[in-house]
């Protein structure tokens, strides 16, 4: 587990190779890493591949040897991730600015766009400044809590507050998963650690700071209430989940079923995977967290193996972006080729989980 923590620390440090050149943040410490990331792309690509493969290998080793940590280590992992730079996405900056628009500028991010506040220095290192908020109202309201830190006038404090907020929901999701795994699979505790230590989940949540765990925390809480025959609470929390990012609304039909009629986690994971393909031009890696959150609770181990394999490919598919430095062709094709190719790991992982 010490090696796992060290590799995680290296990934946290690696994240600063992608720091936007317009963001003068920790500058004395991060300038060498920025130079590596932006001007030595072949080398930084090899480093990413090497770190990712090592991290996944250590992840599987910990699962095989049952070398799993206590909650204190999970808190340490979360703490380290708070200080990382969101290396593969600018979404976190949009979360922050949407909250700032409401709290500081008294503007509606669904009717106005960030570009209308061009004097704000945050726009120097933001993307998608010409579009209104794409998230559901539930997330925008929730983001106002960490957004209150904007009243300090300090960007760094607001950034850390948002990271802490998202890390808190990651820990909350783990708490619910622990209860669900204990209830549904008392002799297979590895299912919990399969999600808790998954490299894709850690990178996309604790480094990149995506809000998907907020949606999935509420969805899994709804499922837990459903298992306990609290249908009204389940329905309410599922609606709250959909109010974050819409996707989990597809789970509503499954909450009308009960007993042995259907493996809810299995079908939920497949339904959420299908949602990803409704916008094939935006097959973002972090969307896989939706399906994987339920896949670890699915009864068929082949399905667990398939989704675990997809998480491997979902992280490695950033490789073309790092190498080319943009998202234009041939990056889109290469990214999806890597992702599809990761399916060849499914039978190997199936043997691994059955061993």
Give the residues covered by each predicted segment:
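Transmembrane helical bundles and short interhelical boundary loops of multi-pass, membrane-embedded
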Residues: 1-51, 264-288, 292-355
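Transmembrane-helix motifs of polytopic, lipid-linked glycan transferases
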Residues: 4, 53-62, 160-184, 216
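Loop-to-helix entry region of an early transmembrane alpha helix in multi-pass inner-membrane enzymes
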Residues: 42-45, 137-140, 151-172, 180
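Transmembrane-helix signature of polytopic, membrane-embedded enzymes
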Residues: 67-70, 177-199
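Intramembrane catalytic core of multi-pass membrane enzymes that act on lipidic substrates
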Residues: 68-161
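Specific aromatic-rich, kink-prone transmembrane helix
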Residues: 172, 176, 214-230
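Membrane-interface alpha helices of multi-pass inner-membrane proteins
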Residues: 202-204, 231-254, 270-277
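Short acidic/glycine- and proline-prone juxtamembrane loop motifs at membrane-interface regions
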Residues: 206-212
């Amino acid at each position: 587990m010490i090696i796992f923590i060290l590799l995680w620390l290296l990934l946290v440090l690696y994240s600063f190779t992608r720091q936007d050149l317009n963001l003068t943040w920790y500058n004395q410490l991060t300038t060498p890493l920025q130079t590596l990331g932006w001007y030595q792309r072949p080398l930084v690509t090899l480093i990413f591949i090497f770190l990712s493969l090592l991290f996944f290998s250590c992840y599987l080793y910990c699962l095989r040897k049952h070398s799993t940590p206590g909650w204190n280590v999970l808190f340490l992992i979360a703490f380290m991730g708070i200080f990382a730079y969101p290396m593969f996405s600018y979404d976190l900056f949009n979360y922050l600015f949407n909250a700032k628009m409401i709290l500081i500028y008294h503007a509606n991010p669904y009717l106005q766009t960030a570009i209308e506040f061009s004097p704000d220095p945050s726009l120097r290192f933001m993307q998608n400044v010409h579009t209104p908020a794409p998230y559901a109202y539930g997330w925008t309201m929730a983001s106002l809590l960490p957004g209150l830190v904007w009243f300090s006038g300090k960007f760094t404090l607001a950034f850390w507050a948002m990271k802490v907020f998202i890390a808190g929901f990651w820990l909350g999701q783990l708490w619910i998963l622990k209860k669900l795994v204990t209830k549904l699979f008392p002799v297979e505790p590895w299912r919990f650690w399969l999600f808790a230590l998954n490299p894709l989940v850690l990178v996309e949540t604790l480094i990149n700071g995506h809000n998907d765990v907020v949606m999935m925390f509420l969805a899994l809480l709804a499922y837990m209430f459903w298992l306990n025959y609290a249908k009204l609470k389940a329905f309410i929390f599922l609606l709250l989940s959909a109010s974050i990012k819409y996707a989990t609304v597809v789970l509503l039909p499954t909450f009308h079923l009960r007993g042995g009629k259907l493996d809810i986690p299995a079908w939920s994971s497949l339904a959420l995977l299908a949602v990803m393909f409704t916008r094939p031009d935006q097959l973002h890696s972090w969307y896989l967290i939706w399906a994987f959150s339920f896949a670890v609770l699915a009864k068929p181990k082949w399905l667990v193996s398939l989704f675990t394999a997809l998480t491997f490919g979902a992280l490695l598919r950033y490789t073309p972006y790092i190498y080319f430095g943009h998202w234009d062709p041939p990056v889109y094709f290469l990214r999806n080729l890597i992702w599809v190719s990761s399916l060849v790991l499914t039978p190997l992982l199936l043997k691994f989980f059955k061993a």
